[in-house]
Amino acid sequence: MTQKVHNASYAAFALFAIGILPAFSQGTIANSYIQHNLVSDIAGMADFTDSHLVNPWGISESASSPFWISNQGSATATVYNGSGVASATVASVPNGATKQSLTGPTGQVQNSSTGFLLSNGKAASFIFATQDGTISAWNGGTAAGIMVDNSPAGAVYTGLALNAAGPTLYAANFHSGKIDVFDTNFHATTASGGFTDPNLPSGYAPYNIWNLGGKLYVTYALQNSNKNQPVSAAGNGLVDVFDTNGNLLQRLVSNGPLNAPWGVAIAPAGFGAFGGALLVGNFADGTINAFNLTTGSSLGALQTQTGTPIVIPGLWALVFGNGKSGGDPNTLYFTAGIQGQLHGLLGSIAPPAAVTSLSNGASAGAATAIAPGEVVLVNGGTIGPSPSVSGTIPTSGSMATTLSTTTVTFNGTPAPILFASASQTGVVVPYEIAGSSTASVVVSYRGQTAAAFSIPVAASAPGLFTSAETGSGEVVAFNQDGSLNSTSNPAARGSVAVLFATGDGMEDPSGQDGVVNNYIIRAPVLPVSATIGGQTAQVLFAGSAPGLLAGVLQVEVVVPTAASTGAQPVVLTIGSASSSQQSATIVLK
């Protein structure tokens, strides 16, 4: 029975110990941000080099997809995850029938509706606008297909938005000074409100349009004499807010620090000093300014850690990640046509790395103290990559202490890393902290080092692993026959059940950081007891789980015959500390 349990438990632990990723992040309050370059067509300028990324404008993504980027300079669309790793997908975006002096894709949208069908009878996945007046769409293959060609009329499409509820497509026509509207069949239509601002100054035209939270934010820039380029000067910019029928809701921002504004995003609460603000990026001077989302009052420009404004020449799109393949939701991603739009840059902007709390890796509860060898979750912001990266449990040797440039130390000793992500990193507390009253936790990522986070050290801090990876619900337990305990597979009263926990503290022989438990069985130096359904459960064995990483405790108990049937609470006590998971249960029959 024991060997069956050991084999099955390895698969279970791989699912929850490496995969525990509940979201948590909290920004700092200072106006201090760090720019990181992810991809460029110039070698050495960013983490990755891609020759297609020339003057990238628009960014779009679905709820879980990577970033899709419109490269005006190479007439392509390319795909990258939140860390800048490129997909093999490269789609060309064609020119119109009447090729103008300005070509290539600008704005783009991801289509989540069932409309906008292409020739293959399937809905478009991504839709692109171009400076030479076309709208193209893609749902597979190596090239987008032209669905609208207004190049003969001289249209200059510099931005694109979509209302999936219509579905309706909106294109900013910088040349005509209008918002062109298209129905689900790519046919020209009109919006009842007409996107009219009676107080729009002469010479201003829509430079971009964004759908943010169901409202359409239109940025305006001053046209040059040819009505195809913006005039650069401080104050040359406006932001209006419309509903999806083109009715003006408000003039949100007038002039001020705006200078050919194009990128617009609403910052989440976790984005430091400007959480909840409207962020507007200026193409002309490369700054990003924050405004009150309701009143439009200026809140200032995003600054570096030295207090100077962040300046990104040729700045285009601004977008926050989707929390999946498309980056961290508390990190701002941008595109830029650097060096006079002859080259390109995709990058990120985030608050400095910060640790805000620790949690027990099994119970997921906030840790008031940690124990040597405990699996813990380090919570914070900008402390790892997005999307997350999982470590590998070694068959021999030790678990790595650096993962995707993330390191975590406890009183200077590197911790084995289970996974790393932007808002949470899973580690095993080094046994070397034993004897210390407190631990200084320091996270480093991409050369940044977060301020030390101090937490008391306890002799033990037990937590039970649960199937839902939340610290509540059914615990990860195996019945006497080696099968996984569940509602449909309860354990018999009087039988043996096997539980898995962490936080038992020091062991005998001493635990070793990051190693896989082998045939040397290490037992907790503190006494171990358990209750099921409020009844004492005899502990037959408590020690390191063979085949699993040091820090994972296996506890074999006899299910008390006096316990009730159904889901019954389980409490594990090691020394003077008990698991505090009121709703952690095992199912009995």
Task: Please report, for each region that a protein language model flagged, where it lies by residue.
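Bacterial N-terminal signal peptides
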Residues: Y10-A23
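Prokaryotic Sec-type signal peptides and long signal-anchor helices
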Residues: A17-I20, N199, I338
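A sequence-level detector for low-complexity, Ser/Thr- and acidic-rich stretches
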Residues: Q26-N292, S297-T304, A317-G323, G327-F334, ...
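Bacterial N-terminal signal peptides that target proteins for export
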Residues: M1-F13
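Glycine-rich phosphate-binding loop at the start of an alpha helix
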Residues: I312
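Amide-donor transfer/coupling interface in amidating biosynthetic enzymes
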Residues: G307-P309
